[in-house]
């Protein structure tokens, strides 16, 4: 196979890897950590392979120094990791759990010492159980204030140490799998609720980014997105239109809001089918 190098990567390109708190940390009930919706969801029979869970995972909480040493050995330039909301606020709000905050400060310092740029994800799907039980989590606009306050604590605590932030990790995944396919918490199959949850997540994302700029945090912030392109199978105009509509429904439904603050027309037309008349003014 012939490989052609079209352009060299710049020297400051951030080669790295990423994880999520629930995927790697373990220590699910240690040092004051509260329960998340994933702690409950994995205990529902049939929801995970062989009833596996993240109670221990790879024990990153206790072995992060070894893990960072391995990252350095690999030559990573950056490491993106998420914060477990329930380590900072065990009930989703209230008093800060200092032990949880100290863990992430120690991890960040270890990364910096190893010459690895820390990149922080504020939310990677592990919503505090308390907020889900109190007001339905992402189904209530109350979460906007709670998420923003949580983010502000992290912005201030990591100021000057973390320069790259991800507000929401793959919003299209946690809204679709949580509220359309029931493969993620809270295990719902309801298009109407999915569209409403997604809109509230958009508002929360914007609120957190605005807070970041209001606090004059040095760095960059934005959401991440799980993008899968859609191509027409041939040049038939009907198939080209179908591919364009699929792009609207599966990608631009999120990306257009992030970039332009508007939903694409095709996606709005579909979502309005599933949204009852009294609800519509709140969503457009």
List each model region and its residues.
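Aromatic- and Gly/Pro-rich amphipathic surface segment
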Residues: 35-69
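Catalytic domains of carbohydrate-active enzymes, especially glycoside hydrolases
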Residues: 63-84
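Active-site region of glycoside hydrolase catalytic domains
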Residues: 2-48, 91-93, 101-276, 280
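A common structural microfeature
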Residues: 12-14, 61, 78
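A generic structural signal for short
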Residues: 55-56, 95-96, 197
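Glycine-rich, proline-tolerant flexible connector loops at the mouths of alpha/beta enzymes
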Residues: 83-96
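Short, cationic motifs built from Arg/Lys/His that form the positively charged side of catalytic pockets
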Residues: 80, 87, 277-279
């Amino acid at each position: 196979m012939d490989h052609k190098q079209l352009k060299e990567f710049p020297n400051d390109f951030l080669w790295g890897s990423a994880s999520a708190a629930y995927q790697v940390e373990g220590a699910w009930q240690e040092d004051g950590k509260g329960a998340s919706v994933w702690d409950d969801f994995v205990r529902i029979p049939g929801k995970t392979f062989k009833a596996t869970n993240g109670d221990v995972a790879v024990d990153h909480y206790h072995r992060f120094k070894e893990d960072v040493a391995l990252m350095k050995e690999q030559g990573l330039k950056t490491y993106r990791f998420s914060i477990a909301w329930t380590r900072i606020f065990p009930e989703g709000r209230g008093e800060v759990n200092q032990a949880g905050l100290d863990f992430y400060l120690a991890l960040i310092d270890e990364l910096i010492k190893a010459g690895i740029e820390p990149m922080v994800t504020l939310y990677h799907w592990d919503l505090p159980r308390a907020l889900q039980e109190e007001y339905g989590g992402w189904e209530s606009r109350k979460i906007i204030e709670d998420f923003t306050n949580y983010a502000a604590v992290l912005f201030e605590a990591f100021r000057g140490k973390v320069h790259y932030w991800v507000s929401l990790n793959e919003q299209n995944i946690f809204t679709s799998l949580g509220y359309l396919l029931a493969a993620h918490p809270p295990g719902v199959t309801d298009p109407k609720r999915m569209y409403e949850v997604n809109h509230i997540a958009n508002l929360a994302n914007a609120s957190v980014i605005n807070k970041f700029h209001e606090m004059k945090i040095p760095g960059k912030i934005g959401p991440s997105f799980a993008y899968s392109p859609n191509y027409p199978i041939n040049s038939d105009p009907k198939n080209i239109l179908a591919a364009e509509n699929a792009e609207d429904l599966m990608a631009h439904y999120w990306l257009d809001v992030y970039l332009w603050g508007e939903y694409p027309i095709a996606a709005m037309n579909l979502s309005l089918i599933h949204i009852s008349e009294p609800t519509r003014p709140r969503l457009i």
